[in-house]
Amino acid sequence: GWGFYRLLDSLISDLGYPGSWPRQLYKTRHGRRGPRIVVVGGGTGLASLLRGLKEYTINLSAIVTVADDGGSSGRLREEMGILPPGDVRNCLLALADAEPLLNKLFQYRFTGEEGTLAGHNFGNLFLAAMGDVTGDFLTAIKEFSRVLAVRGQVLPSTLKEVYLEAEYTDASVVRGEHKIPQSGKRIKKVSLVPADAEPLPEALAAIAEADLIVLGPGSLYTSIIPNLLVDGITKAILRARAPKVYVCNVMTQPGESEGY
């Protein structure tokens, strides 16, 4: 809505760029690439922010969590041994200049209660297939970006297979990103397994070169913090000279931030 665009105007204006997004869009299309903005997160919150930011700049880098293990993404990582494609796909489509029908196709989810395709998202399957064709997940993302004329880049925070583990205030522990909010317990801390996952070099470079670094919006413990747990990401953000902005969710989230 209007408040969202006012937020974006404020962020960009603070960097010395015109506040009016139509004016900035005009300049971007006529040779000015815009400020270098890095957004860290995952889930639908990150994709929503990217849709707004791409109207200001094509120098966008989305650093995305790969700890998801539920739904279609979880099935694909278990059956094919790939990184979960869901959050990456959402960000790619948010930054795409694709036709509406093509966008709708890549967001299509197979329905039905039986069959191997039931519950799978077509875009997830496409990314998985592209990974097989190109030989690795990062190249698959780059080729997907080319197909959809993506503005900017989408980068997994790590290429290591990682899982998210939560410890609650009652000392109980659960492993699995999709399980964490379901317990109804208050989260004490979350950690990555393994804890020494190496960051993607391209992600570190994007952070170092950024004019603005944005954290969120999104699920605090299962979308934003997992990126910061990747070894080296937090240090890179702290070292960067760019202003850092945390975009808080409008509402608290059951299973994650009640009472905050």
Question: What kind of feature is each model-predicted range?
Answer:
Residues L220-V230, G255-E256:
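Glycine/threonine-rich flexible loop motifs
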Residues I58, A240-K244:
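A short helix->loop->beta-strand "cap" motif at the edges of active sites that frequently abuts
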Residues G1, Y5-L8, D14-P18, A67-K185:
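Electropositive, gly/pro-rich neighborhoods at or near active sites that engage anionic ligands
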Residues A210:
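An anion/phosphate-binding loop that grips the pyrophosphate of nucleotide cofactors and donors
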Residues R33-T57:
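Acidic, Ser/Thr-rich low-complexity segments on the non-lumenal side of membrane proteins
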Residues S10-V38:
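N-terminal signal-anchor transmembrane helix
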Residues S20-Q24, K189-L204, L229:
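Active-site glycine-rich loop that binds ribose-phosphate moieties when present
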